[in-house]
Amino acid sequence: MKFKIAFAIYLIVCLLYYTLPVFGPVSLRHILTLIMLVWCIFEQGFIFDKFLKWFCVFLFFSAIGSIVTGYASVFFSRLLGTYLAAFVIYMSTKVVIKKYNGGRWVLSVVLIVAVLNALTAIGQFYGNPIATFLLQLLRVDMSEEMMEFYENTEDFHGRYVGGLLGIVTSGYFLSGACVLALYNAKKKISVYNWLLFAVLFFALFLVQERSGLGAAILGAFLYIMVNTVNSKNAIFRLVFVFVIAIVVISRYGGGLVDWREMRYSTVGFEDVGRANLSMKGWHYFLDNLMGGIDGFHAAGNRDPHTVFVNVFLYGGMFGGLVALGIIFSQLRKVLQILYESFRKKNHSLMLNVYNVAFFCYILNSFFHNASLVSGDVMTFLLFGGVNVLLEMEKAESCSQIEIDDNLSNNINSINPIVE
């Protein structure tokens, strides 16, 4: 139980308080990362599976690119901060789920943070004084919150609602959390699941992340299709929730265009359009085949907004190919689990909910920057959950086959066949 509590604290720190300083450049996340790494080794040995090995190959090429472009110190700072934390989250997730049967524990911690994030986003949008205490507790700058509220118009026009994690990260996080909210061990989605889903989905809508909203809708449909006893009834309820959301959007979302970034218009496309950003990243890579994301940033460029370019900016030509191999391998595993669940219904509810939530993160990475190569914590956590739950299912299946074989041999020895 101590390890599970430590994991919960560590995950919350990684998501919300990762910049909280302790002394000098050392943050609370740095200290807890080392503690959890040592603890993981004592609990289950040093976990260094095939995924982590290939990711280390990617990091090797990423380091070379950073050294060549003169940003070695920045890379090693990212290595000891972001990447090491992602590694430890991956390993500790596997330990919690495998050794302590903590799949629901991990899911619960994520949902607690998701609810706090959702309530904060809703409070930000409405400027409700009730949200003040929560915002202060979670270290959100209240002066900026109030100033932004008074500057905004009555609709969504120009309004930034980032929750606790920021606009894009909240889009990722809430889309996966919407799927996790539908998990029920009894294989029947309850009223509480729907209420939790509705709150998270509403907050996701307020955040205005289009890819996150689409991923949440698709993920919810997929999870319901492969898991519920009465799929038609559950889908009817889900459609009802979406209809209510559409009514709200139609009534209050007339000014949804975020004009400051022009995310919903073609005006200013040359400067901030996603295709233009991706092309700038691609051209930079062609001029610097060894990569170097920090050099790209130093030149005044914004991130390319797609993992297919980011892999080459972070890892160069060779590291990018390695990262693409990892991502396509992950996508293949996700789709295979979904296919098997549709055809045979032989995977656990827990595996399916982690799998679909991870699928949402993969979809988001196609249109944004947080991904495997950036060391996104939730990407590593959800994939760690998928891997360990699949390993446990295979081990259980092999154990059952061995038991059946032994039973068959015992029966044959007791009742020899007489010709």
Where are these regions (language model features)?
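N-terminal signal-anchor transmembrane segment
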Residues: 1-45, 60-69, 361-363, 377-381
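Aromatic-anchored transmembrane helix interface
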Residues: 54-60, 72-95, 105-110, 114
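Hydrophobic transmembrane alpha-helices and their immediate junctions
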Residues: 189-193, 217, 221, 225-228, ...
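Helix-loop-helix junctions and helix-breaking kinks within/between transmembrane helices
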Residues: 18-30, 65, 72-81, 165-170, ...
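A membrane-periplasm/extracellular boundary helix in multi-pass inner-membrane enzymes
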Residues: 119-128, 207, 227-269, 282-286
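TM-adjacent membrane-interface loops and short helices in multi-pass inner/ER membrane proteins
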Residues: 259, 266-303, 308-311, 315-322
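Transmembrane alpha-helices of multi-pass inner-membrane enzymes
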Residues: 34-39, 217, 221, 354-364, ...
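Alpha-helical transmembrane segments of multi-pass inner-membrane proteins
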Residues: 107-141, 154-208, 213-226, 332
